[in-house]
């Protein structure tokens, strides 16, 4: 009876599962009706199949939908408790991940940097302070902290008051040597709303020194100094440092799919190698070693950036699943990764999706959307209590809602009681 009641629920609720903030075209409406009819019949067909065969049968029928005449999908579902794959379809096909690339970046970052890592911005100077006058050079040293904000800048300004400085004579430099001079990622579209890849930002903008000088003057400090860019000397004295934790960065990076935060994380990975300046190539090398560690060949994939904006990223559902498995089996990574993932029906980019009782609060996964691509990768718990990880990449979908609907139905089947 329990299985029968669930299947009745599945039949009547699946067509409305995905909450989409996109205008519905006439083609979408007709496809929705056709999909709903197919779902109803395949749910009835799955009535008496045991887990996981019933889900496999359900997925097989979903894959017969008309949308796959003009689009592709790769998916893999892995039972973490049984340590075995339960669903595979085109799982090794190379596809653009869109923002599920952020999951790869996040796992690599926690693995390489550790859960206590902090993003740091420093204020340093050379010279001397006499009679309330600082004569020398000031260095604002960027560590690519995307959360550096007005409060942090005020702390920089207040540090001079604490030193008794009311006049600055010399130079005020931006030290941006933490990373290379590339301000855009490889393979980014010129007409996208791309973040600026500068290691010294304020409010996400590359106007740090201008804002700093303005705040100094507003606080009554006389600034008689030229501005420019230069590396901080080794003998410079650091007045104050501002920090943000890796968890703070992960939270916005994954829940809100923030591209700037993801690229900052990508360059922290690169910086951890000790190479200066940090480059995308260095980050790729670190992630490549992690891919080897999970038993796959990094040369099979193309990793261009940390956010998934690039047209040059090519990964597979298998790669994403194996990295999610690695994170789960390494407690420190999982401890920091899981709370940062969007939660179905509750927050982030999944707030308005999968609100039914079995998936809401259960599915924790990263979404991905770029033109023609819709993806979802993360974790959920099946009705039998087993933890699952999964990756679904829809490619060639001209209406993202169709990909999201497919992904939601897969997750509902995984989470619902049999």
Regions found by a protein language model. Name each.
Residues 74-78, 86-88, 105, 137-141, ...:
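Soluble periplasmic/extracytoplasmic beta-strand elements of cell-envelope proteins
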Residues 205-338:
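A small/polar active-site loop signature that marks catalytic segments
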Residues 83, 97-115, 172, 211-215, ...:
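Active-site SXXK
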Residues 21-81, 87-94, 158-164:
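Beta-lactamase-like hydrolase cores
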Residues 302-418:
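C-terminal soluble interaction/assembly domains
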Residues 1-26, 46:
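Bacterial Sec-dependent N-terminal signal peptides
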Residues 68-72, 90-92, 98-101, 116-118, ...:
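Extracytoplasmic
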Residues 43, 47, 121-127, 133-216, ...:
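Active-site-adjacent helix/loop patches that line small-molecule binding or acyl-intermediate pockets
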């Amino acid at each position: 009876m329990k299985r029968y009641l669930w299947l009745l629920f599945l039949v009547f609720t699946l067509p409305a599962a995905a909450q989409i903030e996109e205008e519905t075209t006439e083609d979408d409406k007709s496809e929705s009706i056709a999909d709903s009819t197919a779902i109803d019949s395949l749910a009835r067909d799955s009535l008496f199949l045991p887990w996981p065969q019933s889900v496999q049968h359900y997925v097989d029928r979903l894959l017969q939908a008309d949308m796959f005449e003009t689009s592709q999908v790769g998916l893999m579902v892995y039972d973490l408790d049984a340590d075995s794959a339960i669903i595979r379809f085109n799982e090794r096909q190379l596809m653009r991940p869109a923002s599920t690339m952020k999951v790869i970046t996040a796992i690599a970052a926690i693995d390489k940097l550790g859960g206590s890592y902090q993003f740091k911005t420093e204020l340093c100077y050379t010279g001397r302070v006499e009679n309330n006058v600082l004569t020398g050079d000031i260095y604002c040293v960027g560590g690519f902290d995307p959360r550096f904000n007005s409060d942090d800048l005020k702390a920089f300004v207040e540090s001079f008051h604490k030193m008794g400085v009311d006049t600055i004579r010399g130079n005020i430099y931006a030290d941006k040597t933490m990373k290379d001079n590339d301000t855009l990622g490889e393979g980014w579209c010129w007409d996208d709303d791309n973040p600026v890849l500068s290691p010294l930002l304020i409010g996400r903008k590359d106007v740090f020194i201008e804002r700093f000088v303005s705040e100094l003057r507003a606080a009554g400090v006389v600034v008689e100094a030229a501005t420019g860019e230069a590396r901080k000397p080794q003998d410079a004295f650091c007045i104050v440092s501002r920090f943000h934790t890796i968890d703070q960065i992960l939270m916005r990076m994954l829940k809100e799919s923030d591209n700037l935060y993801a690229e900052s994380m990508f360059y922290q990975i690169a910086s951890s190698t000790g190479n200066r300046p940090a480059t995308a190539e260095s980050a790729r090398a670190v992630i490549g070693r992690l891919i080897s560690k999970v038993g796959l060949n990094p040369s099979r994939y193309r990793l261009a950036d940390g956010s998934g904006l690039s047209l040059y990223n090519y990964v597979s559902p298998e790669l994403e699943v194996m990295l999610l498995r690695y994170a789960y089996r390494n407690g420190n990574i999982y401890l920091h990764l899981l709370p940062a993932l969007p939660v179905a029906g509750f927050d982030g980019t999944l707030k308005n999706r999968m609100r039914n009782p079995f998936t809401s609060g259960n599915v924790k996964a990263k979404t991905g959307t770029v033109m023609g691509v819709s993806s979802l990768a993360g974790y959920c718990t099946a009705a039998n209590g087993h933890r699952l990880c999964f990756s679904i990449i829809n490619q060639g979908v001209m209406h993202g809602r169709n990909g999201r609907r497919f992904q939601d139905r897969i997750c509902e089947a995984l989470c619902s009681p049999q």
